[in-house]
Design a protein with these regions (language model features):
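A beta-strand edge to alpha-helix "cap/lid" segment located at domain peripheries
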Residues: 50-125
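Hydrophobic pocket/interface hotspot
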Residues: 19-21, 28, 41, 45, ...
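Short hydrophobic/aromatic segments of transmembrane alpha-helices and their interfaces
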Residues: 1-2, 28, 82-83
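Short acidic-aromatic low-complexity motifs
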Residues: 2-23
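A solvent-exposed, acidic/Ser-Thr-rich amphipathic alpha-helical stretch
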Residues: 18, 25-70
Length: 125
């Protein structure tokens, strides 16, 4: 079983979008904290994750905790945007080939969700 989490950290730390493309399954499902419906497929997931990378890396984004069990990982992060301390988690699942099949993002507090919604909206326009 291949674990893509170390490669995911490379994507985040280096903004390595080529590696991001390589570790996403073609049928990956992305769950945004600000969009009700799941986003299905590699292309739309790439758009969301690349936009998030630009928004989050402009701040002091940092992972603090990581729990891995079988083919699932929970990564807790913090960042500060517009003087608002934000924390959240990325829940990541992958298949036997080590390709990410599901990516869920949870963020708190509500003020942080609203800020990220606005900034992500600007990036995705």
């Amino acid at each position: 079983m291949n674990n893509p989490i170390s490669k995911w950290h490379d994507v985040v730390n280096l903004r390595d979008y080529n590696t991001l493309t390589e570790i996403l399954d073609d049928h990956v499902i992305f769950y945004s904290p600000v969009v009700y419906t799941p986003q299905r497929g590699k292309d739309i997931t790439l758009k969301y994750l690349m936009a998030a990378s630009e928004v989050f890396n402009a701040s002091n984004f940092k992972y603090h905790k990581e729990v891995i069990h079988k083919q699932h990982a929970c990564l807790e992060f913090t960042l500060t945007i517009e003087d608002t301390d934000i924390n959240g988690i990325d829940l990541i699942s992958w298949n036997d080939s080590g390709l990410i099949t599901e990516f869920k993002v949870f963020i708190r507090p509500l003020q942080g969700v609203n800020i990220i919604h606005k900034m992500m909206g600007n990036m995705l326009e």
